[in-house]
UniProtKB/Swiss-Prot annotation:
Cofactor: Mg(2+)
Domain Protein kinase: 571-832
Sequence ranges assigned to domain KEN in this UniProt record: 835-963
Record field: compositional bias (Low complexity): 513-552
Residues at the active site: D688
Protein name as catalogued: Serine/threonine-protein kinase/endoribonuclease IRE1
Stretches of the chain found on the membrane's Cytoplasmic side: 465-977
One Pfam short name: Ribonuc_2-5A
Disordered as annotated region, ranges: 410-434, 491-559
Keyword check for rRNA-binding: no
Annotated compartments: Endoplasmic reticulum membrane
The gene coding this protein: ERN1
């Protein structure tokens, strides 16, 4: 069970009754009690006096949706347990057999009803000043923030568990929650710990009692429900047990123990004693924090109203508390029942499926049964299993529905409940005698079955000779057709535009190959029919105009190979390069003695093929867009001849032995972006950019390869003056690479070309990380995209190249489409700069700000946040020879970005005058020189580039920044004057 969050710290009252010695002037962690509350506070309080020393405020323990869907999930802030309300069987409240941390550990997993579970676990360390509670440092896998060091430090670990449920049927987010927990060891039976803590549900009232004498040590109210207590040991925090009781019960017991405000003795038995178990009843408390519901186990006495199991709305008023409860001001009050009604207006506003029962009583419910849930098809091996609620490992073939319904063990007198989906049968049930009616029905069924069998045999004997005769006639007709085909090929063999070398094929060879080929005509180009054989061959433009050019097979002398020829296009059906959507097949073929790829398209996709051809004709003038050659048609298919490529980007990245032939990843991404910018300049949105649709060309005459964008089947041509397209025709693209605005119902504006930028950003990370995706594994990607849950962990936060890449990719995959750069902006980014251009940029910036005032906007922007860029003092992070040389001529400020750039410029200008030792440490110009500084200050280039955007319009910086040209204004006519 994962460690629970640290909530409220209990203060100790009544110093005369304290069990500790005198207060020390030095606060040691062993003298503190740590109390964690639902609102995210961690209070450090004195064990003896109960006074709060300090409070650490963090995010709430639970973060759940504000709406309630069906079924509703109620988490337990104490340990992350889950309860459901409003299931299909209307069972009321039920307890699920797993917690949020366990689900995160088991994810990714999928339920039998189509729910995808995605989990995320993130750890963070807080370094706390023990005296003040101030955070000195925050450590995580992504960042590390620090303040001034302190001598007394406390290290607290906190874990964030995030679980997301995505419904594949409705394509909607089902539920998500975040649960926080502090790292602590589990509670133990510690004889040295002499205190018992009683916590009220629904508020922050805590009563701390001496567990041996029964003396009440102190009472404190923390204004938020308490979820955990901790003490400090040498190895860290250790959780301390506490008892959740009803507010009425706690106030009732304290009232019975003495005068208000002067409680001296706890007269009620402790839960450890058997007497207490008979007087306190376990229940489940349903509470409301902020706008969300939660559930927590609670003990109540006989006077507290409890909602019966399976009910959500009481039919009669509950019983009143026998004793008198005490209000905050000391007056006697009757604790009112509390209920909440969900606003029906939210149902139409948010389009949610609300609960069948709109009323849910907030208060104490009878302990619910454990759910026979279909959340998981099977428990993964890494999910902690309990013997009483999991199918044994040797029965994997059984479905999850066969798991017996779980019965809550907290109430000994609770009746055994059978699942509504699965009926339990006794192990040795006596056999039921067979009724006469059942026997008669069986006899009638036997007679009917025998009659049908007899009729079937008679029909078979009569029809078999006739069917054999028809089959022989059909075979004879097929034989005649094959002979006609051979004669046609022999007559027209000299007219074929493509004739492989070798002797003329023999009749028998063609006959042998045509049989099996015609059988596979569903996935290959068909043979010429007798009707098509009467037409003469057409080629070139005439074939396209006629629209019915016949396709012919020609044998090249190999028994297993045949060639299909349609106009100027020819290909071998057995040489398949790949398969596309809607039955499209890509073959290796020939066009005008050139190797090409031939796409064979089905008739139902002809309109899409025509649009693709039109877009290819418009866009193939760019070297990084696939080249189009020709299109042909026959009676059944359409064929498109395009440039033949060597591989896809996926093979380039994932095949370690792939020959890159000098095509570096950054160059490949630059070429891809250049092709995308060309498409966007033609108002073409690709809408399906992914590694499979980015191809690697065949080596040219110089042995070089390049990247090209292909597959224009889902492209959209925007009309002149339009910058967006409608989503009414569906959601194009491949799952896991689709921009969030394409699927989000909250997006009111139509998508634009930025959907391609989002996909390109994912491709960038895929290439740089050598196969990873910024939104996780394939099963989780689209759900994470909708949630904006990305991770760029493969990019090192202190490596210059990775810092530049992160800065660009984060912009490209931004959730807000308007924050994404255009393709031309991306091409101007420093990610694509050579080392020489980086050094030139630093020099130009230094020249520009040399005479700029320190109070000027440019210098202020450059120095804002600059101390982190130069690591507080850049002079201490360079080599000693360079430090010594810099001190000879002028004074530089170690905390100034401006002075660092000035030093780089001066040493570059006077490089040949530098001492040999300094030149050796700086390296050669320009590559080694600029790497010397960027390796020591990895954020320098990104920071300087962002700061100097103020001057991007100046002529000096035009090579480094992109500006959209102003839209042309309509000419002014004399009539308008």
């Amino acid at each position: 069970m994962p460690a629970r969050r640290l909530l409220l710290l209990l203060t100790l009252l009544l110093p005369g009754l304290g069990i500790f010695g005198s207060t020390s002037t030095v606060t040691l962690p062993e003298t503190l009690l740590f109390v964690s509350t639902l609102d995210g506070s961690l209070h450090a309080v004195s064990k003896r006096t109960g006074s709060i020393k300090w409070t650490l405020k963090e995010d709430p323990v639970l973060q759940v949706p504000t709406h309630v869907e069906e079924p509703a999930f109620l988490p337990d802030p104490n340990d992350g347990s889950l309860y459901t309300l409003g299931s299909k069987n209307n069972e009321g409240l039920t307890k699920l057999p797993f917690t949020i941390p366990e689900l995160v550990q088991a994810s990714p997993c999928r339920s039998s009803d189509g729910i995808l579970y995605m989990g995320k676990k993130q750890d963070i360390w807080y370094v706390i000043d023990l005296l003040t509670g101030e955070k000195q440092q925050t450590l995580s896998s992504a960042f590390a923030d620090s303040l001034c060091p302190s001598t007394s430090l406390l290290y607290l670990g906190r874990t964030e568990y995030t679980i997301t449920m995505y419904d594949t049927k409705t394509r909607e987010l089902r539920w998500n929650a975040t649960y926080f927990d502090y790292a602590a060891s589990l509670p133990e039976d510690d004889v040295d710990y002499k205190m018992s803590h009683f916590v009220s549900n629904g508020d922050g009232l805590v009563v701390t009692v001496d567990s041996e004498s029964g003396d009440v040590l102190w009472i404190q109210n923390y204004a938020s429900p308490v979820v955990a207590f901790y003490v400090w040991q040498r190895e860290g925090l250790r959780k301390v047990m506490h008892i959740n009781v009803a507010v009425e019960t706690l106030r009732y017991l304290t009232f019975m123990s003495g005068e208000v405000g002067r409680i001296t003795k706890w007269k009620y038995p402790f839960p450890k004693e058997t007497e207490a178990k008979s007087k306190l009843t376990p229940t489940l408390y349903v509470g409301k924090y902020s706008t969300s519901l939660y559930a927590s186990p609670s003990m109540v006495h006989e006077g507290v109203a409890v909602v019966p199991r399976g009910s959500t709305l009481p039919l009669l008023e509950g019983p009143q508390t026998d004793g008198v409860t005490i209000g905050d001001k000391g007056e006697c009050v009757i604790t009112p029942s509390t209920d909440v009604k969900f606003d029906p207006g939210l149902k139409s506003k948010n389009k949610l499926n609300y609960l069948r029962n709109y009323w849910l009583l907030i208060g104490h419910h009878e302990t619910p049964l454990s759910a026979s849930t279909k959340m998981l098809e099977r428990f993964p091996n890494n999910l902690p299993k309990h013997r009483e609620n999991v199918i044994p490992a040797d029965s994997e073939k059984k479905s999850f529905e066969e798991v017996i319904n779980l019965v809550d063990q907290t109430s000994e007198n609770a009746p055994t409940t059978v699942s509504r989906d699965v009926e339990e049968k006794p192990a040795h049930a006596p056999a039921r005698p067979e009724a006469p009616v059942d026997s008669m029905l069986k006899d009638m069924a036997t007679i009917i079955l025998s009659t049908f069998l007899l009729i079937g045999w008679v029909a078979f004997i009569i029809t078999y000779p006739l069917s054999m005769h028809q089959q022989q006639q059909l075979q004879h007709q097929q034989f005649q057709k094959e002979l006609e085909k051979i004669q046609l090929l022999q007559q027209q063999q000299q007219q074929l535009p493509f004739h492989p070398p070798g002797d003329t094929a023999q009749d028998g060879e063609l006959l042998d190959t045509s049989g099996p080929y015609s059988e596979s005509s569903g996935t290959s180009s068909p043979s010429t029919s007798p009707r098509a054989s009467n037409h003469s061959l057409c080629s070139g433009s005439s074939a396209s105009k006629a629209g019915s050019s016949p396709s012919l097979e020609q044998d090249d002398g190999d028994e297993e190979t045949s060639v299909v020829i349609v106009g100027k296009i020819s290909f071998c059906p057995k040489d398949v390069l790949g398969h596309g959507a809607e039955g499209t097949i890509v073959y290796r073929g020939m066009f005008d003695n050139r190797d090409v790829a031939v796409k064979r398209i089905l008739p139902e996709c002809f309109s899409f093929a025509d649009r693709e051809v039109q877009l290819l004709r418009e866009s193939d003038e760019h070297p990084n867009v696939i080249r189009y050659f020709c299109t042909e048609k026959d009676r059944q298919f359409q064929y498109i001849a395009i440039e033949l490529c060597a591989a896809t980007l996926q093979e380039y990245v994932e095949q370690k032995d792939f020959a890159h032939l000098g095509l570096e990843p950054i160059t490949l991404l630059q070429q891809t972006t250049s092709g995308l910018a060309h498409l966007h300049s033609l108002n073409i949105v690709h809408r399906d950019l992914k590694p499979h649709n980015i191809l690697i060309s065949m080596p040219n005459a110089h042995g070089k390869i390049k990247a090209m964008i292909s597959d224009f089947g889902l492209c959209k041509k925007l009309a002149v003056g339009r910058h967006s397209f409608s989503r009414r025709s569906g959601v194009p693209g491949t799952e896991g690479w689709i921009a969030p605005e394409m699927l989000s119902e909250d997006c009111k504006e139509n998508p634009t070309y930025t959907v391609d930028i989002f996909s390109a950003g994912c491709v960038f990370y895929y290439v740089i990380s050598e196969g990873s995706h910024p939104f996780g594994k394939s099963l989780q990607r689209q759900a994470n995209i909708l949630l904006g849950a990305c991770s760029l962990d493969c990019l090192h936060p202190e490596k210059h190249e990775d810092v530049i890449a992160r800065e660009l990719i984060e912009k490209m995959i931004a959730m807000d489409p308007q924050k994404r750069p255009s393709a031309k902006h991306v091409l101007k980014h420093p990610f694509f700069w050579s080392l020489e251009k980086q050094l030139q940029f630093f020099q130009d910036v230094s020249d520009r700000i040399e005479k700029e005032s320190l109070d000027g906007p440019i210098v202020k922007q450059l120095e804002r946040g600059g101390r982190a860029v130069v690591k507080m003092d850049w002079r201490e992070n360079i080599t000693v020879p360079l430090q010594t040389d810099l001190r000879k001529f002028r004074t530089y400020k170690g905390g100034s970005v401006r002075d660092l750039l000035r030093a780089m410029r001066n040493k570059k200008h006077h490089y040949r005058e530098l001492p040999a030792e300094v030149r050796e440490t700086l390296g050669s110009l320009p590559d080694d020189f600029v790497c010397y500084f960027t390796s020591r200050f990895p954020h320098l280039l990104a920071h300087t580039y962002r700061a100097m955007e103020l001057c991007s319009h100046e002529r000096l910086f035009q090579p480094y920044y992109f500006h959209e040209p102003p839209e042309p204004q309509p000419p002014v006519t004399p009539d308008a004057l």
